[in-house]
Structures are given as C-alpha cells and as structure tokens.
C-alpha cells in the first residue's frame, strides 16, 4: 500500500485545477484454492490483484482514472492528467488527513493466508478418504477449499482515511453414489468470514458422513408419485 504522504501528493495533484473533491481507492486481493478428486490433487493455485482508482469531481462533472501500477510519480501524473480533463471553475483546498483507521469485518484469530497448502490438502483428503471408504456405493469424492483476503483503503480530500480488511473461506465436499447408470450426490459447502480456526473446529467427518448418507438415500429412492 502507498504511504499517507504519497497518497496526499496524489490528492493534491488531483485538486490542483478545478476539482472540488477527490478521492483515492486502493484495493488488494489475495486468493488461494485447492481441489481434490478421490483424494488426489487436481488443482491448486493462488492469485494476487492490486489496483488504484482516482476520482475527481467538480459539481456534477466526474473524471475517474485507474491503474495497477502503484508508482507514486506515475500516479501523480495520472492525477494531473485527470485534473486537466475535468471541467469546472472552482478551486478547493485539501483538508488535513485524519489518522488512519483500521477495521476488520470479523475477528480473525488465524490468518488463512499463513496456512500452507499441504495443510489444506490434508484436511480435504481426510474427508475424501472417509467418503470413499464409507460404503461401496460411494464411487467418487470431490473436495475443495477456497480462501480470499481483501484489503481496501479509501482516502479523500475531506481528510477521510480508512482501511478495512475482510477474509473469506469456503470448503466443499461432495460424495457421489452410483447404481447402474444412475448417479446421485450429497454435498455440503459452508462459508465463513472467520479465520482458519473455522477449519480447525469444523466437524468435517460428521458432515462427510451426512453427504454419503444423502447420496445413498437418493440412489435408492423411488420416483415421486405423479398426479
């Protein structure tokens, strides 16, 4: 993330012509995922996205520019170009920046991004192996884990200075029962905005058992009566 001083330089540049308001929006996203089929890893990946948006307003006129390059000098030039493009006739001063306020959407005890993928694989494999050994009718087990972390920073010419971080996790386990040419599934896919403590506390074996029972019950169920 950019420092307060560099963000203020960007806002000063944005307000240097006719803008009566300017704000800077910075967003950083991280994600990690892993998927298993019958206990074998079939996909694993991570991603990182970072970008900044600069908005200038003069009355009802708005100019918005954005970039994924957080070089301060380049962003100052971008803000100056936006200021040149904005139509208006006012000249406002920039208020002193507030102390940065950090918030988190939920109480995170263990950052999921700090967990190695091997631990995620071991967690999912435990569910997959249980499902495959539960009953001969269960012929396939699919499991996945996805986590994402989003940090947003908003600073404006009125002195606002806020930053918020949110974290999300979703796991999914699916058991497939087969009988002849017919297949039926049982599945659970809980999501949370907690940290990795959610995974440590989750009764994955109990839930996997429920998935298997659902799939087996469905495969033996008759058709609903018509009429």
Model-derived regions: residue spans:
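Active-site bordering "gate/hinge" segments
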Residues: 1-227
């Amino acid at each position: 993330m950019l420092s307060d001083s560099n963000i203020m330089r960007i806002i000063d540049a944005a307000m240097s012509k006719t803008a009566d308001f300017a704000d800077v929006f910075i967003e950083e996203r991280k994600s990690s995922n892993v998927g298993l089929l019958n206990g074998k890893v079939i996909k694993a990946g991570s991603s990182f996205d970072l970008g900044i948006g600069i908005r200038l307003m003069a009355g009802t006129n708005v100019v918005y520019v954005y970039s994924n390059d957080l070089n301060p000098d380049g962003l100052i030039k971008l803000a100056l170009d936006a200021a040149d493009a904005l139509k208006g006739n006012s000249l406002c001063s920039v208020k002193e920046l507030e102390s940065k306020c950090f918030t988190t959407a939920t109480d995170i005890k263990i950052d999921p991004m700090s967990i190695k993928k091997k631990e995620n694989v071991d967690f999912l494999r435990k569910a997959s192996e249980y499902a495959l050994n539960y009953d001969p009718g269960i012929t396939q087990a699919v499991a996945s884990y996805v986590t994402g972390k989003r940090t947003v920073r908003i600073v404006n010419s009125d002195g606002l200075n806020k930053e918020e971080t949110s974290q999300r996790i979703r796991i999914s386990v699916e058991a497939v029962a087969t009988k002849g040419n017919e297949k039926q599934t049982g599945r659970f896919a809980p999501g949370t905005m907690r940290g990795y403590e959610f995974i440590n506390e989750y009764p994955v074996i109990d839930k996997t058992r429920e998935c298997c029972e659902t799939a087996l019950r469905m495969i033996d169920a008759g058709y609903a009566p018509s009429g």
